[in-house]
Amino acid sequence: QFEWAIHHPLALAAGTARETLDDLAVGRWPCSMSADESAAWDFTREVLDHHGVCDATYADAVGRWGEQGVVELTALIGYFVCVCWVMNVARTPAPGAPEGGPLKPFPG
């Protein structure tokens, strides 16, 4: 919840479509993402669900961002997972839910 509360307004300010954030807020697959956002989302979900990615996902990511970009995205995913684990264990309170309320669990 902390990361959602902090990053929701930043995502809006960076140009993420409100519809994308609304979908995420209720646990729906975001439908209004750009091609790059969608590729990053697919890559991230695959890493989180399977602890790796298939050859097609990897090839698409390398084609978009290069090998360095794929390493950076993977490191970013790992960093945020680790931060969230620590914050969950420490029961870090969110600084207040963004508009739309707290993030719902994503169906997995």
Residue ranges of model-derived segments:
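Hydrophobic alpha-helical segments
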Residues: Q1-G108
